Amino acid sequence: MPLNVSFANRNYDLDYDSVQPYFYCDEEENFYQQQQQSELQPPAPSEDIWKKFELLPTPPLSPSRRSGLCSPSYVAFASFSPRGDDDGGGGSFSTADQLEMVTELLGGDMVNQSFICDPDDETFIKNIIIQDCMWSGFSAAAKLVSEKLASYQAARKDSGSPSPARGPGGCPTSSLYLQDLTAAASECIDPSVVFPYPLNDSSSPKPCASPDSAAFSPSSDSLLSSAESSPRASPKPLGLHEETPPTTSSDSEEEQEEEEEIDVVSVEKRQPPAKRSESGSPSAGGHSKPPHSPLVLKRCHVPTHQHNYAAPPSTRKDYPAAKRAKLDSGRVLKQISNNRKCISPRSSDTEENDKRRTDNVLERQRRNELKRSFFALRDQIPELENNEKAPKVVILKKATAYILSVQAGEQKLISEKDLLRKRREQLKHKLEQLRNS
């Protein structure tokens, strides 16, 4: 690089070496190698991007079995997997082998969907779409199944195993199906453990006439009606013929757990009020149920005037019984008075207006009398006799001074009166002496 000559302190070769793994020297990844080999048109880049993140479905697989014909998976798969009459649907494979391989690959997802709704129904397609969106698409599963079937078929041809006997129509005979059913009956799982509710409205399940018959596809309404009509009924097993597989101890325990769960879910219907009234009537005799306690009635009654939600928490004290009774009676009287006031709001308003009017009149009279008394006091004071604008404080002060002066003059006059009386007494006594002499 030419920059290495001008900048000696900076070694750009080392920098290039550090970032060299991020550059590709005329080497481009061939994303379309598989498509070119298969002579297909290369897809859009968006599809390749999604293909990089594509995940194959990996649900938990059930244990491998000899044949899947005796399990409900065959019944469900037969309803949406048609078979041709000319090639038997699988070339050198029997229908039982094909079903076993498909069931092991798919993990029973499509089989479980067939129990819920009809495969031809639109809801079944929607359910498949929803389920496959969770597992990254249905196309990957279909492609994987086709590749696995091709590999199994090639391995079967290489091994040179003879093909099973076929009937006149190109399909395996019914005796082979029945033989496979009876041979693998002990290895199958009881369908009642997986699906406890019966598929039809009748009390007993109808056995299929032949393995080629379509599966039962009950609607949701029939399932709900059967579940509601018999919530405590024992689950009915599903099968292709009259023989039911033997149940082990684990199966019986699982059935008991299912029954217990159904009992928990079931809602106990209470006795209607009419029947309760009949049972509580005197005609029922000694067997009649006692009526509800008053505590229940008290709880049902919700007073709206006894609790204030905006108030702080109350700090009530435990009073004696007598005091509590008095308080309760006082509360009742207060409630009655409040109710009376609330009953006639117009009368209370008129009473308040009348009372206010009378109070105003009395207050006016009191003020007028006080004013007249002040005027009279002012007239008695010589200094303020002609002063009409004299304030009340001046009137009171002058009146006090005038009263004190009047009291002092009174005492002086009383003392003079006493002196004059004594003088009179002396003069009278002297006059008497002059008369007698």
Curated annotation (Swiss-Prot):
Residues 335-347 have a biased composition (Polar residues). One of its GO terms (molecular function) is E-box binding. Residues 354-406 form the bHLH domain. The keyword Cell membrane does not apply. InterPro entries: bHLH_dom (IPR011598), HLH_DNA-bd_sf (IPR036638), Myc-LZ (IPR003327), Myc_transcription_factors (IPR050433), Tscrpt_reg_Myc (IPR002418), Tscrpt_reg_Myc_N (IPR012682). GO terms for cellular component: host cell nucleus. Residues 201-358 are annotated as: Disordered. Residues 413-434 are annotated as: Leucine-zipper. Residues 266-278, 315-331 have a biased composition (Basic and acidic residues). Keywords: Activator, DNA-binding, Host nucleus, Oncogene, Transcription, Transcription regulation. It holds the Pfam family HLH. This protein is synthesized as a Gag-vMyc chimeric protein. The sequence shown here corresponds to the Myc homolog fragment of the chimera. Participates in the regulation of gene transcription. Binds DNA in a non-specific manner, yet also specifically recognizes the core sequence CAC[GA]TG. Seems to activate the transcription of growth-related genes. This is Viral myc transforming protein. It comes from Feline leukemia virus FTT. The lineage of its organism: Viruses, Riboviria, Pararnavirae, Artverviricota, Revtraviricetes. The gene is MYC.
